[in-house]
């Protein structure tokens, strides 16, 4: 339960998700619903509806919205290129904390408003935002609606999957000015594309277009046209959310932790997670749905 509404997050609540945010926001005299006495009525009303928007008194650079079991985190400073400063990094951390407290969520979509995802620049020191994103137990799908450079690319690397528009470019141009990545860029990039391509991008500071990014494994999908990005997102979302929530969590854990283990240790981790999964309701549902020739109805338990 939250003690107060988050200062830097706009919350679009569906059903009873983040009920603590309802109460906390109302206690701070939300512009949407003022009297705290209305809380039970509003919470009850929210059942089965599309959602109720709550706007804390202080809005900021990050938006958090919920749609059923998918949370969307949006960088919302398009006029500033969605640059990641300390304020935005703090807001991202708070959004990730809220997401981590909701066991009903199965996927996080991370994107930006405007024509870029997040670009390097500005006179203020960049904030560090990759750690809270990479620490999320559920899959994180990064939707690159435009360029991602410097700290913005480092943030994108903290996700599990990346899709982009065909016009997007990626790189670390700040290296030309002696600025070294400081939010995991030198570590996550080689783990994703391999040390050779990582050195290519880091040492030259050159920009990589969407086509090349796909070929080296920096992104997983490229929309054929900018307007088709939503369709690519919808397809991937359906595939991820339609599977076992526990299976997705364990797969993410096995890959993430396995990268830092020897092969034998990684195989032991994989075996252990399989043993745990075998005892879950989701595993039983998977077997039953196959035998009954129907689609599975996973509960995440």
Identify the meaning behind each predicted range.
Residues 78, 163-168, 210, 219-268, ...:
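C-terminal long alpha-helix characteristic of the crotonase
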Residues 6, 12, 18, 22, ...:
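Conserved CoA-thioester-binding segment of acyl-CoA-metabolizing enzymes
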Residues 133-135, 143, 149-202, 216, ...:
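CoA-thioester-processing core
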Residues 56-57, 89-93, 97-100, 107, ...:
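An acidic, glycine-rich surface segment that forms the CoA-thioester-binding/catalytic face
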Residues 150, 205-212:
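Acidic, divalent-metal-coordinating active-site segment for phosphoryl/phosphodiester hydrolysis
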